[in-house]
C-alpha cells in the first residue's frame, strides 16, 4: 500500500485558525473486529468537531472527513492506534467552509462497492505509478488508458486520450471489462480514479482476470494535480470530488461547477440557466426522468434547505453524501421492484 500523503495547500489557499481541513483517506486491510470500531470512532470524530462519512468493512476503511486541523490530526492519531490502521493513505486539502453537515461511521460489506467476491488488493494489485512518471506511461501507444470513475465524474475532466467506460456506478466496471478488454489483445492497461481506492480494486480485478501488465496512478488524480505542474499536465478539465465543492481545478481550489441533486451531474452557470433547471429538483439532463413523486419530494427537501440557510443553519438534506445515499437507495429500490415483477 502507498504511504500516507499530506496534500499541501496551494499558494492561493491562505490557512487561518478557521480554515477547514478536508481529509480523504482509505486503507485496504483485514479488519476482523470492524463492527466494534464504529461507536468509538464516531464518538472521537464528534468530540473534535469532525464531520463527514467513514465506511468500515472487513476489507478496510474508506471515506472523507472535514474539520479543524487539530480535529483531523486527532482522528488520524486515533485510527493509527487501531490494529492494522497505521499508515493510512490520506490526502488533505483546505476550504473556508465544512462541506459536510453530519458525522457518520457506517458498516459496509465493501469499502468501495464492486460486487465481486474475493477481490483483495492486499493479495494482488497492479503496479503503482508515481505522478511524475504518469505522463510517460500514458504516452506509450501500447497502453490502454481507462478512467474507472463514473460518467458524471468524467463529464468535467479526464486525462487526454482516456477511455470512458460510461458506467453509472463502480458495480458496472466488471461488465465493462468483460465486454471491452481482452487480456490477449490489451497487453498494457493503465487506470486511474480520484484518490486511488477504486484503482486498487480495479487493478486487483484485472490481475485476477489474467491481465499481466496493469498499472494505476498512485494517489489518484488529486495527487497528480498536486505534484505535476500545470505547464506539464495531461489532465484536461476539473476533478469531481464527493463533497460540497463538487470539483477542484488544477490548483486544487474549488472549481466552477455546481451539481444537480437529482442526477448528480455537475452543472455550469450556463447550464443552470436552462428552463429545465430547478434547484434541488432537476436539470436539463434529468428533467424528463424525474417522477412526479420524486419531484415533489426533492422540492420539499430544497425548501427545507433554503429555510435552514435563511436561519443561518445547515440542513442534512444538503449534504452531498446524504444525497448520494438517497439516490443509491432509489436505484436499489427500483431494481428490487423490477426483479419482483
Swiss-Prot record:
Active site, per annotation: 193 (cysteine persulfide intermediate)
GO biological process: tRNA modification
Basic and acidic residues composition-biased segments: 306-316, 324-341
Enzyme class: oxidoreductase
Signal peptide span: none
Coiled-coil regions listed: none
Gene3D superfamilies for this protein: 3.30.70.100, Rhodanese-like domain
Reaction catalysis annotation: uridine(34) in tRNA + AH2 + O2 = 5-hydroxyuridine(34) in tRNA + A + H2O
Function recorded in the entry: Catalyzes oxygen-dependent 5-hydroxyuridine (ho5U) modification at position 34 in tRNAs.
Name of protein: tRNA uridine(34) hydroxylase
Originating organism: Colwellia psychrerythraea (strain 34H / ATCC BAA-681) (Vibrio psychroerythus)
Name of the encoding gene: trhO
Amino acid at each position: 500500500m502507498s504511504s500516507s500523503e499530506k496534500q499541501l495547500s496551494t499558494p492561493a489557499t491562505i490557512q487561518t485558525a478557521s480554515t477547514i481541513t478536508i481529509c480523504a483517506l482509505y486503507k485496504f486491510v483485514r479488519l476482523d473486529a470492524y463492527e466494534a470500531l464504529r461507536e468509538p470512532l464516531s464518538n472521537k470524530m464528534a468530540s473534535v468537531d469532525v464531520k463527514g462519512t467513514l465506511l468500515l468493512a472487513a476489507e478496510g476503511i474508506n471515506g472523507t472527513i472535514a474539520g479543524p486541523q487539530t480535529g483531523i490530526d486527532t482522528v488520524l492519531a486515533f485510527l493509527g492506534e487501531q490494529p492494522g490502521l497505521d499508515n493510512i493513505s490520506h490526502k488533505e486539502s483546505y476550504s473556508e467552509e465544512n462541506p459536510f453537515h453530519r458525522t457518520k461511521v457506517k458498516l459496509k460489506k465493501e469499502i468501495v462497492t464492486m460486487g465481486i467476491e474475493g477481490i483483495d488488493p492486499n493479495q494482488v494489485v497492479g503496479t503503482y505509478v508515481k505522478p511524475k512518471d504518469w505522463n510517460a506511461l500514458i504516452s506509450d501507444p501500447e497502453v490502454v488508458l481507462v478512467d474507472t470513475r463514473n460518467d458524471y465524474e468524467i463529464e468535467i475532466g479526464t486525462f487526454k486520450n482516456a477511455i470512458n467506460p460510461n458506467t453509472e456506478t463502480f458495480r458496472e466496471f466488471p461488465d465493462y471489462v468483460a465486454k471491452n478488454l481482452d487480456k490477449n489483445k490489451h497487453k498494457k492497461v493503465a487506470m486511474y480514479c480520484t484518490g486511488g481506492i477504486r484503482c486498487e480494486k480495479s487493478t486487483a480485478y484485472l490481475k485476477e482476470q489474467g491481465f499481466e501488465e496493469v498499472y494505476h496512478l498512485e494517489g489518484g488524480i488529486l495527487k497528480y494535480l498536486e505534484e505535476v505542474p500545470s505547464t506539464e499536465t495531461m489532465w484536461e478539465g476539473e476533478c469531481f470530488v464527493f463533497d460540497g465543492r463538487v470539483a477542484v481545478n488544477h490548483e486544487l481550489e474549488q472549481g466552477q461547477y455546481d451539481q444537480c441533486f437529482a442526477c448528480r451531474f455537475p452543472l455550469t452557470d450556463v447550464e443552470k440557466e436552462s428552463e429545465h433547471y430547478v434547484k434541488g429538483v432537476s436539470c436539463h439532463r434529468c428533467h424528463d426522468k424525474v417522477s412526479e413523486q420524486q419531484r415533489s419530494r426533492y422540492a420539499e427537501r430544497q425548501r427545507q434547505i433554503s429555510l435552514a440557510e435563511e436561519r443561518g443553519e445547515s440542513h442534512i438534506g444538503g449534504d452531498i453524501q446524504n444525497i448520494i445515499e438517497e439516490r443509491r437507495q432509489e436505484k436499489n429500490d427500483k431494481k428490487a421492484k423490477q426483479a419482483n415483477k
